[in-house]
C-alpha cells in the first residue's frame, strides 16, 4: 500500500502488477480505519514498513508531515498488527538516527549500540518511530525487527536525491548544486542489496533485534559529483557550491558486522 505522494511512481510496479500474488492499494498509513479494513481483508503474515517522508530539506521546511507519516503512521500499522495478529513487523529505518561522525576519525562507524542522536526533523522522526517499535515489542510482545541502512541508490530513485539529481542536471547542462564544501561523506548501498538484506532479516532475523545495513562504499559528495560528470563527459564547471544545509551531518559510516556474522549478508554491488 502506498499513498502515492509527489515521489510516488506506479510505473515502477509494471514488472509485478499482473502477478497473482500481488495487489496494490492506494492508501495513507495514517488512515487508521482504512488500514484496519485492509488488514481485515488480507490478514497479512508479515508487514514491512518502507513508508516514510525521507527528504531532509523538506523536513526542515515542514516537519509536521514527517511526524505524521513516520511516527503516527508507524503506530497505526503496529496497532493493526496487534489487532489482527502477524508473524513479523519489520521497520525500515536509516543510519541518520545515529547523527554523524567526524571526518578526521575514519576508524569510527555506527553500530547497533550507537546512541541515537538525530540531527534533522526527518531523522528525529525516524528515531522516534524506532523507539516506538521497540516499545511495542517490550510492552505488547509484538514480533518486530528494525533495519537501519546507509544511503540508497539505484533504478527509479526520485530525482530530489543526490545521484539522480546530479545526473539529470548534468545531462541537461544545468548547474549541479553542492552543499557547503562538498566534503560530507556518505556510505552508498545499492537498492537491491538493501532489499535482499531486509528479506533475510524477515526470514532469519531475531525478533526484537536491530540490524545495520551498509554498503562499504564511503565517498564524499563532491567526489560523487565529479565522478558523474566524468562518466557523462561533462565539465566540472557545472558544479555550483551553495549555502550548506542547516544541521548538515558531516559523515555517515555503518558497520554491518552483525548482519554479516549472524545472517551471512554482504553487499554484492560495488559502488
What would you call each of these model-derived segments?
Residues 27, 164, 170-271:
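C-terminal substrate-binding subdomain of Rossmann-fold SDR/epimerase-dehydratase oxidoreductases
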Residues 8, 33, 157, 219-223, ...:
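Residues that form or flank phosphate/diphosphate-binding pockets in enzymes
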Residues 1-152, 192, 265:
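N-terminal Rossmann-like NAD(P)+-binding domain of SDR-like oxidoreductases, especially those catalyzing
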Residues 126, 148-151, 156, 186, ...:
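Short, cationic motifs built from Arg/Lys/His that form the positively charged side of catalytic pockets
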Residues 128, 132, 136, 166, ...:
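Hydrophobic alpha-helix immediately C-terminal to the catalytic Tyr-X-X-X-Lys motif of short-chain
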Residues 10, 75, 101, 125, ...:
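Gly/Ser/Thr-rich beta-alpha loop segments that engage phosphate groups in nucleotides
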Residues 10-13, 101-104, 157-160, 224-225, ...:
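Short aromatic-enriched loop/helix-cap "lid" or pocket-rim segments at secondary-structure transitions
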Residues 68-71, 122, 126, 156, ...:
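Short, solvent-exposed loop/helix junctions and linker helices
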Amino acid at each position: 500500500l502506498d499513498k502515492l505522494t509527489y515521489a510516488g511512481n506506479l510505473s515502477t510496479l509494471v514488472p509485478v502488477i499482473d502477478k497473482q500474488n500481488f495487489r496494490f492499494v492506494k492508501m495513507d498509513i495514517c488512515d487508521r480505519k482504512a488500514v484496519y479494513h485492509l488488514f481485515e481483508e488480507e490478514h497479512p503474515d508479515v508487514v514491512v514498513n518502507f513508508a516514510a517522508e525521507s527528504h531532509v530539506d523538506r523536513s526542515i521546511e515542514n516537519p509536521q508531515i514527517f511526524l505524521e507519516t513516520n511516527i503516527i503512521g508507524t503506530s497505526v500499522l503496529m496497532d493493526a498488527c496487534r489487532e489482527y495478529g502477524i508473524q513479523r513487523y519489520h521497520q525500515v529505518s536509516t543510519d541518520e538516527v545515529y547523527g554523524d561522525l567526524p571526518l578526521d576519525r575514519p576508524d569510527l562507524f555506527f553500530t547497533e549500540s550507537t546512541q541515537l542522536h538525530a540531527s534533522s526533523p526527518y531523522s528525529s522522526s525516524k528515531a522516534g518511530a524506532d523507539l516506538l517499535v521497540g516499545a511495542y515489542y517490550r510492552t505488547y510482545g509484538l514480533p518486530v525487527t528494525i533495519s537501519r541502512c546507509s544511503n540508497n541508490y539505484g533504478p527509479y530513485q526520485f530525482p530530489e536525491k543526490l545521484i539522480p539529481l546530479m545526473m539529470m542536471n548534468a545531462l541537461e547542462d544545468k548547474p549541479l548544486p553542492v552543499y557547503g564544501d562538498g566534503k560530507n561523506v556518505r556510505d552508498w548501498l545499492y537498492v537491491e542489496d538493501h532489499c535482499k538484506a531486509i528479506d533475510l532479516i524477515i526470514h532469519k532475523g531475531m525478533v526484537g533485534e536491530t540490524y545495520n545495513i551498509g554498503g562499504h562504499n564511503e565517498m564524499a559528495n563532491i567526489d560523487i559529483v565529479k565522478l558523474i560528470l566524468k562518466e557523462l563527459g561533462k565539465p566540472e564547471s557545472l558544479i555550483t557550491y551553495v549555502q550548506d544545509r542547516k544541521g548538515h551531518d558531516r559523515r555517515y559510516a555503518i558497520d554491518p558486522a552483525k548482519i554479516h556474522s549472524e545472517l551471512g549478508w554482504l553487499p554484492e554491488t560495488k559502488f
